[in-house]
Amino acid sequence: MEYTYQYSWIIPFIPLPVPILIGMGLLLFPTATKNHRRVWSFPSILLLSMVMLLSVYLSIQQINRSFIYQYVWSWTINNDFSLEFGHLIDPLASIMLILITTVGILVLFYSDNYMSHDQGYLRFFAYLSFFNTSMLGLVTSSNLIQIYIFWELVGMCSYLLIGFWFTRPIAATACQKAFVTNRVGDFGLLLGILGLYWITGSFEFRDLFEIVNNLIDNNNQVHFLFVTLCSFLLFAGAVAKSAQFPLHVWLPDAMEGPTPISALIHAATMVAAGIFLVARLLPLFVITPYIMNLISLIGIITVLLGATLALAQKDIKRSLAYSTMSQLGYMMLALGMGSYRAALFHLITHAYSKALLFLGSGSIIHSMESIVGYSPDKSQNMVLMGGLKKHVPITKTAFLVGTLSLCGIPPLACFWSKDEILNDSWLYSPIFAIIACSTAGFTAFYMFRVYLLTFDGHLNVHFQNYSGQKSSSVYSISLWGKQVPKRIQNPFCLLNLLTMNNNESTSFFWNNKCKLDGNVKKRIRPFITVTHFPNRKTFSYPHESDNTMLFSLFVLVLFTLFVAAIGIPFNQEGSDCDILSKLLNPSINLLHQNSNNFTDWYEFVTNASFSVSIALLGIFIATFLYKPIYSSLQNFNLLNSFYKRSANRVMWDKIQNWIYDWSYNRGYIDSFYTISLTGGIRGLAELSHFFDRRVIDGILNGFGLTSFFLGESLKYFGGGRISSYLLLYSIFIFIFLLMDSFFTNLPFFVLCQFLDSSFSMSISGFLLYENFLYENF
């Protein structure tokens, strides 16, 4: 066992040969490497599988022995400074290793088919393997310096993968946005690391925690404030990496990368890195109560914000991205409350559920591309979907399992972990608990909204009702594909938000009359306006994905069904079946938490029934609003008559419009950043440019112009006439003496006498000089 731990340092470097060999192959043998590009998926999967087996073995040893292994190499630079590098294998590292490798293998297996048509296939697998290497190095780091190095490598890989299709301007902009936003957090992380080293003299976790504890125990207020500041800076790095408020704005734009990358980034790697950092540094944060309160506050804000922003998204991947943001907020909330076990439990269950949802969405997008062509604006648009359950039944089943899990429906994975966080939130703060429980209802609503828009009803892409010609007939098409005759003037249309522009003030349920162009002056606005897209259609309907993609979905379904078994807290006296608690025992003792908590069935049912009822309410509302049966209710005008009786219809419309605008415009946070930060920086740049060109250059150019015009003016006085020189000489002498008499109070008559005598002498001298010139020349 000791032998295995000693060589565990090689874990991060096992996948590294793949990007190195791909790069060398493209440089030395480009034609052969490209011709046999599909071969490279095998070593990528094989090497990561080796890491997974080693990680599972280490985790088994952790469970059986509750053992923490750390090995450090010291590099002495001089007598006063040395760097220490090593690796740390503890329960947290073991959990993250299994999470990264299992999800990574399935993503690699899935990507082999998903990216087979792409010219950047080799580049994709090189990036992906290096991404896995960086993340494995991050979770096994034994000190803050190593964490920062691999932290930056993870950020670099995410930049490359988000902008994988860099020829698309929107993808290039998205990767730059992610990179710049994360630079804010990374700068804070670097300052926090340097600050802690300055006060403790060590980067190692154990030494750092011990020294900081001693400093705080001495009741030194200066040390406490400085440690609090450093902790805040460290937390800023986690906020950016895990897309927490207010540095979350990069997350939805990260969807411009390939879908397998979205699954990896939003499930087990990049966004999980911030949660991992807070969990790793939790002993430091625990001794600074203000930081713990800040962590929980940021977490609960992100929980609610992510859920509300997901309500009106048309893009299926953006909806899942905001869902990820909200679920990461739950984990951050749990860490801020001190619920270390609940946070890691939800990290595990959410990783597999969200990977299943993203890979399922990739299967959906893959099937839609055969109809609408390659265009993310069309293939990812849920407005053009619908009725896919008849065409992609396996994907539908897998997506439904992931949706139910994320909604918190038992016995699926996320139910157990989310319920534990909700229960702990009632003990921490009733206000936070109310917000967290309400968000659970929002989660169920928007996730079933995504499911119903995608799989129920009819395929909406086949209803192309406006071709841009005068003679084209206009239909008002309901969400589920049923053509409504043009004579209907005020149909009660479900969720008009799907076709609204950002500046429109249309309610959720009522259509407006609006101008479209010169061909159509005024018409009833259709629920879905689909322009005819000229493309080659290989299939008239979507088709199920290949078996290699479905295999990854099947394995993730199994994980979603059974992974929660490792953490179900039904421990009774005399039995201990909670594997997660046994694994986390060393960490729990480090945090001074009691691990002997037993949960009986009555308490569990009481707590779970409330959260499940909220989730079912959200599902019911989504089903009521989005289920195809609504079309028949609309035809009978049942909801129309009910809605028209409302006395507060105008107010209700305004509320719905506000909710839609808030969600679709990303809470106006991006706009605020654009106006305040981007606009402010541009304004400062323009001011600097004006000051440089007009003031600095103006002063220098002013001296030059003044000298030029003065020289041009004086050259006319140098005509060669002595009388002119004499006149100027006399004038300057008079001015000088006049100023001198003003400052020295010299009598004026003395000045006149001096001027008269000097003038006479000057005239005599000039006359003699002129006479001399006349006689000799």
Swiss-Prot record:
Keywords: Chloroplast, Membrane, NAD, NADP, Plastid, Plastoquinone, Quinone, Thylakoid, Translocase, Transmembrane, Transmembrane helix, Transport. InterPro entries: NADH_UbQ_OxRdtase_chlpt_su5_C (IPR002128), NADHpl_OxRdtase_5_subgr (IPR018393), ND/Mrp_TM (IPR001750), NU5C-like (IPR003945), Proton_antipo_N (IPR001516). The keyword Chloroplast applies. The chain crosses the membrane at residues 9-29, 40-60, 89-109, 125-145, 147-167, 185-205, 220-240, 259-279, 290-312, 328-348, 355-375, 397-417, 426-446, 550-570, 604-624, 731-751. The keyword Thylakoid applies. One of its GO terms (molecular function) is NADH dehydrogenase (ubiquinone) activity. Its EC number is 7.1.1.-. It catalyses: a plastoquinone + NADH + (n+1) H(+)(in) = a plastoquinol + NAD(+) + n H(+)(out); a plastoquinone + NADPH + (n+1) H(+)(in) = a plastoquinol + NADP(+) + n H(+)(out). It is a multi-pass membrane protein. It comes from the Eukaryota. It is found in: Plastid, Chloroplast thylakoid membrane. GO terms for biological process: ATP synthesis coupled electron transport; electron transport coupled proton transport. Signal peptide: none annotated. GO terms for cellular component: chloroplast thylakoid membrane. Belongs to the complex I subunit 5 family. NDH shuttles electrons from NAD(P)H:plastoquinone, via FMN and iron-sulfur (Fe-S) centers, to quinones in the photosynthetic chain and possibly in a chloroplast respiratory chain. The immediate electron acceptor for the enzyme in this species is believed to be plastoquinone. Couples the redox reaction to proton translocation, and thus conserves the redox energy in a proton gradient. NCBIfam families: NDH_I_L (TIGR01974), PRK06590.1 (NF005141). PANTHER family: NADH-UBIQUINONE OXIDOREDUCTASE CHAIN 5. NDH is composed of at least 16 different subunits, 5 of which are encoded in the nucleus. This is NAD(P)H-quinone oxidoreductase subunit 5, chloroplastic. The gene is ndhF.
